[in-house]
Amino acid sequence: MASTISAYKEKMKELSVLSLICSCFYSQPHPNTVYQYGDMEVKQLDKRASGQSFEVILKSPSDLSPESPMLSSPPKRKDTSLEELQKRLEAAEERRKTQEAQVLKQLAERREHEREVLHKALEENNNFSRLAEEKLNYKMELSKEIREAHLAALRERLREKELHAAEVRRNKEQREEMSG
């Protein structure tokens, strides 16, 4: 029992309180574990619904040799002169102007395209209106001609009936004169 308590105290010293609490609630190992196989490291990344993903890190040949020195510090940047700074500023200004000109050109092209689309839409609308008006006029003319033809046919029948009635009256008068 005493050895268990001393081992527990050693463990408490090694782990932070947060790790201890997490290990109590979550007993499985951390998902981002690193496995080493010879000259490469395999790091497990997030698990996805489509499967698992891994990151493979290969050690460089310089890391493999034991006598190789540690990575050297990066080379120090030399002080830039005022002329170099001026050149960089001018180049940046030129890039900014070029980018601004390109944006303005794209805006102009977009406006021109919008004008063309609007003009085409107006033209199509005018053509549609003109065709609809022509079609309506044609239908009105056709109905007017049909109406006039119908009225002419009615007048012709009425005239024929009047002629027939006049002939019947004449025949009747002739019969009356002959009979009486």
UniProtKB/Swiss-Prot annotation:
One of its GO terms (cellular component) is neuron projection. GO terms for molecular function: tubulin binding. It comes from the Eukaryota. Residues 76-179 form a coiled coil. It is found in: Golgi apparatus; Cell projection, Growth cone; Cell projection, Axon; Cytoplasm, Cytosol. N-terminal palmitoylation promotes specific anchoring to the cytosolic leaflet of Golgi membranes and subsequent vesicular trafficking along dendrites and axons. Neuronal Stathmins are substrates for palmitoyltransferases ZDHHC3, ZDHHC7 and ZDHHC15. It holds the Pfam family Stathmin. This is Stathmin-3. It comes from Bos taurus (Bovine).
